[in-house]
Amino acid sequence: MANGPIEKPDAYGADDGWKKAKNALIVREFYKTIKSSGESIYKEKGSRFLGFTRSVNSEQEVKDFIANFRKSHPQSVHVCYAFRLGADMKHFRYSDDGEPSNTAGPPIFGQIQQAGLTNCLVAVVRYYGGVKLGVGGLIQAYRQAAKEAIISSEIVETEDYFLYEIHCDFSDLPQVMNWLKSQKI
């Protein structure tokens, strides 16, 4: 993932806003995300784990997808998931949905991290097969279902442009530059 300042993005055509942005810093950020949703089926000791990926841009979209998964799979016992939002990849959450602590959400999120994805949701719907899998078995099953769903997705590298215009006294410039550097801007 390469981030950095640019001189003139295509999004700001010569006559379309560029003149206004002439003295501003424009930053282009690249990130990987889901273009086309993916699905997987993983079976272990009679249980079925259905993996799904979706492109999302807000927590509300995540909630809506999870509600739809629950409605579409009323006989399932768990709908576990993880998501990450934003080019900075700092906004994320995961849920074990009643499975033993850290046996579902973290393994799913680990696959999102490993793939370097953001603005995506990975959900795994579990149908219980009558045999307990134990902590290690659950971790492996949720991890594998998530991994296979991600592999079946179409992943693209996307770019966003951010325009920053900062006004300050010349004497404050070193502090401003340090802050920008700390924010990786």
Predicted regions span which residues?
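C-terminal regulatory domains involved in ligand/effector binding and gene-expression control
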Residues: 7, 12, 18, 22-103
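Positively charged, aromatic-enriched nucleic acid-contacting surfaces
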Residues: 100-117
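Glycine- and acidic-rich phosphate- and metal-coordinating loops
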Residues: 118-128
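Conserved structured catalytic cores and adjacent interaction surfaces
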Residues: 137-139
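Stable alpha-helical structural segments in soluble proteins, enriched in small hydrophobic residues
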Residues: 141, 145-153
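Short glycine-/aliphatic-rich beta-strand segments at the starts of folded cytosolic domains
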Residues: 155-170
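Short amphipathic alpha-helix segments
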Residues: 167-185
